[in-house]
UniProtKB/Swiss-Prot annotation:
Keywords: Cytoplasm, Glycolysis, NAD, NADP, Oxidoreductase. This is Glyceraldehyde-3-phosphate dehydrogenase. Its EC number is 1.2.1.59. D-glyceraldehyde 3-phosphate binds at residues 140-142, 195-196. SMART domains: Gp_dh_N. The active site is at residue 141. It comes from Methanococcoides burtonii (strain DSM 6242 / NBRC 107633 / OCM 468 / ACE-M). The keyword NADP applies.
Length: 335
């Protein structure tokens, strides 16, 4: 089998995880990663055997720190079939001209606007839309988490109205620059938040409004979900539908917080302690006065990683069937 050659432009929180996931696949391979600074992540990439590329004016800085560079970002892109852009939000959009000139397919992350690609992706929801596409955007961690539950519930019962409050972590664990440290911040203060419109880029028909708050924690996001459904159903009916979703994990057994979910991920032996699935407290699934309520937790560093793998497979037309691609990705990653 000829493997698809994948380049990773940006090797931070998402990029390094996507690189590791690609390396697990039988139908794709990493031809290089791009970093702009000679930090510990760059050294780790070399230790893993990845070819390191950088900007032309950064080659000297890399070599000064003893990091062998395989070439420039432009050279990496020319050698690839598809590039996964994991550069910081709003930076990735500036790379589109570079990819277009190279005639290469590209995937961006949720920090970029939907208009950049015209195709926002979630594997379980709209895999077919990305088949053969040149440019695709994998939606953010929060939007991914919402699509994973709203899509199957909409198909089964019809979602008449969705109202979601997102309790967002303030920063990733390794981020020392972002806050708040000792405050609760309505973000944004003017409602609704951007998450609802972002969900609609994947599920256009859904009526959804979202509000969001930033909290002084680094571990996960928490969603409080309230749905008005078109068909009558019980909490048990909802639980049965969600139980069939391969990227949804029910939590209980004494787990009452995001801290304990992260501990569970470590106990499962997950790489970096990642939790790729939505974590739903199935005990929270409740029908109250005809409306559905439940809580779910989203690991912001990792839930989009399997989605990037499925996006590659769809764009390169390695697999036309969404369920088959999801099955392959889940098996290789241990989901």
């Amino acid at each position: 089998m000829t493997k698809v050659k994948v380049a990773i432009n940006g090797y931070g929180t998402i990029g390094k995880r996507v690189a590791d996931a690609v390396a697990l696949q039988d139908d794709m391979e990493i031809i290089g990663i791009a970093k702009t600074r000679p930090n510990f992540e760059t050294v780790m990439a070399k230790d893993k055997g990845f070819n390191v590329y950088t900007l032309a004016d950064r080659v000297g800085a890399m070599e000064k720190e003893g990091i062998e560079v395989s070439g420039t970002v432009e050279e990496m892109i020319k050698a690839a079939d598809v590039v996964v852009d994991c550069t910081p939000g709003k930076v990735g959009a500036t790379n589109k001209d570079l990819y277009e000139k190279a005639g290469i397919k590209a995937i961006w992350q949720g920090g970029e606007a939907h208009t950049l690609t015209g195709c926002s992706f979630n594997a379980e929801t709209n895999y077919d839309e990305a088949l053969g596409k040149d440019f695709v955007r994998v939606v953010s961690c929060n939007t991914t988490g919402l699509c994973r539950v709203l899509s199957p519930l909409d198909k089964e019962f019809g979602v008449k109205k969705a109202r979601v409050t997102l309790l967002r972590r303030a920063a990733d664990p390794g981020d020392i620059k972002t806050g708040p440290i000792n405050a609760i911040v309505p973000n944004p203060i003017k409602l609704p938040s951007h998450h609802g419109p972002d969900v609609k880029t994947v599920i256009p028909n859904i009526d959804i409004a979202t509000t969001a708050v930033k909290l002084p924690t680094t571990l996960m996001h928490l969603h409080t979900i309230n749905l008005e459904l078109e068909k009558e159903c019980t909490a048990e009916d909802v639980e049965s539908v969600l139980a069939e979703q391969s990227r949804v994990r029910f939590v209980g057994q004494g787990i009452t917080s995001t801290a304990e979910i992260m501990e569970l991920a470590k106990d499962l032996g997950r790489s970096r302690g990642d939790m790729w699935e939505n974590c739903i407290w199935n005990e929270s699934i409740t029908m109250y006065e005809g409306e559905l309520y439940f809580f779910q937790a989203i690991h912001q560093e990792s839930d989009v990683i399997p989605e990037n793998i499925d996006a590659i497979r769809a764009m390169m037309e390695l697999e036309s069937d969404a369920s088959r691609s999801i099955e392959i990705t889940n098996k290789t990653m241990g989901i």
